[in-house]
Amino acid sequence: MPESPIRKLAPLAAAAKKRGTKVYHLNIGQPDLPTPREGLEALKNINRDILEYSPSQGYQSYREKLVGYYKKYNINVCADDIIITSGGSEAVLFAFLSCLNPGDEIIVPEPAYANYMAFAISAGAKIKTIATTIDEGFSLPKVEKFEELINERTRAIMICNPNNPTGYLYTRREMNQIRDLVKKYDLYLFSDEVYREYIYTGSPYISACHLEGIEQNVILIDSVSKRYSECGIRIGALITKNAAVRAAVMKFCQARLSPPLIGQIIAEASLDAPEEYYRDVYDEYVERRKCLIDRLNRIPGVYSPIPMGAFYTVAKLPVDDAEKFCRWCLEKFEYEGETVMMAPAAGFYTTPGAGINQVRIAYVLKKDDLIRALVVLRKALELYPGRVDDQ
């Protein structure tokens, strides 16, 4: 089981704080923007004598309300197609456990969210990665590269759109390419779409559920964590029109008893957040993205493509080893009492040596803090003993 590149340096950050150093957390996608008032009010107004189990599939009222939410994105589902999970992570795990046998293979573009690898191991499955590169903005390679990986054990393709960790948004051509592969080889398509609200290019959001001819192959993964700054309530969803898959998933749902009661109450109420809430959050991320990328690419030796969605970017640094650099920042460096914490990007790859000089940065800090964090990062790169200028 691999360590999380997002969390494994947390003890070093804790030690730095204990020494009195301020740490700017660019490592984790924990939004700092407020949870919708509607969700917080629902939490305050809970008045129950018993906090009982909820149904294993999730509350009917919440699932019915989600139908209306998805309809806004032209995702046409019914309440029975939706299974509420303990976060999007459980949805991914249950999808793998329900659709894959030990030894089955999933094709995943890399870099990829590191927990996909961990969940595949839990299911006894194997991740086969297809390379995307920072120099090409993490766009997908040609279909032939996918077909080179497909064999008798291939069961699925997994995508995250918009992408974590890269911020890439798949084009219509790329989504059609994936659809054609899924249809040709009768594969499952696991599609993690938790960042659909955050698309910055004017390009359309194309859900896997929009792809014609593979409706029975698609398993959509969703979560309220990033949409409403509700990471702590652990509410996600698995959505599919495939009744056999739903039946298999429900066995795991019954084994874990129920998704969180309190979390569902908050998540259901949060669906009533006004459009102004979404607009304000979106506008804030637009500003942060511009602030980050403009300043990041002005640091000598640093390069980041412009992320098209989500609130992450992967940046190339002028260092010998990004993980060593991230450790050094927390253990041996501080500038005016401050340092930065980032996620070493090698942990988002399975190919040995890939991403060795890259980091994932989450722009989840207020603009002033983001600007200051980049000042500290620039100074750290100037002083780092393992700096490499010619790459």
Task: Walk through the language-model features, giving the residues of each.
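PLP-dependent class I/II
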Residues: 2, 9, 16-24, 29-46, ...
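Generic structural signal for well-ordered alpha-helical scaffold segments
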Residues: 14, 67, 71, 96-97
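Basic nucleic-acid-binding alpha-helical/helix-turn surface characteristic of O6-alkylguanine DNA
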Residues: 49
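Conserved N-terminal alpha-helix of the aminotransferase class I/II PLP-enzyme fold
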Residues: 53-86
